[in-house]
From Swiss-Prot:
First-tier enzyme category under EC: isomerase
EC number, as in UniProt: 5.3.3.8
Modified sites of kind N6-acetyllysine: 48, 76, 222, 229, 255, 283
Residues binding substrate, per UniProt: 93-97, 140, 164
Annotated site residues (Important for catalytic activity) in this chain: 165
GO CC annotations, alphabetized: mitochondrial matrix; mitochondrion
Chemical reaction(s) catalysed: a (3Z)-enoyl-CoA = a 4-saturated (2E)-enoyl-CoA; a (3E)-enoyl-CoA = a 4-saturated (2E)-enoyl-CoA; (3Z)-octenoyl-CoA = (2E)-octenoyl-CoA; (2E)-tetradecenoyl-CoA = (3Z)-tetradecenoyl-CoA
Record protein name field: Enoyl-CoA delta isomerase 1, mitochondrial
Gene3D superfamilies: 2-enoyl-CoA Hydratase, Chain A, domain 1, 6.10.250.170
UniProt keyword annotation of Lipid metabolism present: yes
């Protein structure tokens, strides 16, 4: 109920913002946590994450992101979207641990449903999606990148990408595991998931987690040039092929959404898991201090 109400309010606000005039040849609409720059003549929109300090996937961010994506999917002038961070250095730190710690089961269920929705909307989108990974991308940040049709990462050894949930004492959901296996292969995914491996750019390229590694100042220009190449393919044939390749993986979640929510809620509510999250959060506080 709360998520649906938030979606209605944000859609109304987004509609008002979407009617503003063009700015420097690009139309923008924005909410607190996502900035969208539309380049209608090129058929491209750029979605920039702006949820400081680390672009964590809070419930509010997830809601605003899905609404922004929905607006773009309904815009006939847009054929592709580039996902990136407004703040270089951090693509997204992933799921917001504060949404999973010290809350009640109803909140955990609402949050996990929003996480599922993010993945499904991105994974099944008819738009061409390219991630311009201009910073660290662990866990949920990697989730968003994995849904894209093409991934470009900045060549900076300080940046890493991967699903490191096991290091936090939690487990990646089966549908994200499937996405990972489809991307880097079963054995590489099995090893990386158990160890919580975070890959620097060169290693991410080697295992197939990203498609290109480029100098940091060329990430966005490369994303645009790659998008232009994808635009040479007729939309209908590309979309049908994408659906054919991804439908079985997505259906695996769609058929089990409620069970997955219940499993997550039960798992995250365990005392042992809450204690693990508490320890991890305390370590983060000490690092900041």
């Amino acid at each position: 109920m709360a998520l649906a109400a938030a979606r209605r309010v944000l859609l109304q606000a987004g509609s008002r913002l979407g009617r503003r005039g063009a700015v420097d040849g690009a139309r923008r609409f924005s909410n607190k946590r996502v900035l969208v720059e539309k380049e209608g003549e090129a058929g491209i929109a750029v979605m920039k994450f702006k949820n400081p300090p680390v672009n964590s996937l809070s419930l509010e961010f997830l809601t605003e992101f899905v609404i922004s994506l929905e607006k773009l999917e309904n815009d006939k002038s847009i054929r592709g979207v580039i996902l990136t961070s407004e703040r270089p250095g951090i693509f997204s730190a992933g799921l917001d641990l504060m949404e999973m710690y010290g809350r009640n089961p109803a909140h955990y269920a609402e949050y996990w449903k929003a996480v599922q929705e993010l993945w499904l909307r991105l994974y099944l989108s008819n738009l061409t999606l390219i991630s311009a990974i201009n910073g660290a991308s662990p866990a949920g940040g990697c989730l968003m990148a994995l849904t894209c049709d093409y991934r470009i990462m900045a060549d900076n050894s300080k940046y890493t990408i991967g699903l490191n949930e096991s290091l936090l004492g939690i487990v990646a959901p089966f549908w994200l595991k499937d996405n990972y296996v489809n991307t880097i292969g079963h054995r590489a995914a099995e090893r990386a998931l158990q160890l919580g491996t975070l890959f620097p750019p060169a290693e991410a390229l080697k295992v197939g987690l990203v498609d290109e590694v480029v100098p940091e100042d060329q990430v966005h220009s490369k994303a645009r040039s790659v998008m232009a190449k994808w635009f040479t393919i007729p939309d209908h044939s590309r979309q049908l092929t994408k659906s054919m390749m991804r439908k079985a993986t997505a259906d695996n979640l769609i058929k089990q959404r409620e069970a997955d929510i219940q499993n997550f809620t039960s798992f995250i509510s365990r005392d042992s898991i809450q204690k693990s999250l508490h320890v991890y959060l305390e370590k983060l506080k000490q690092k900041k201090g």
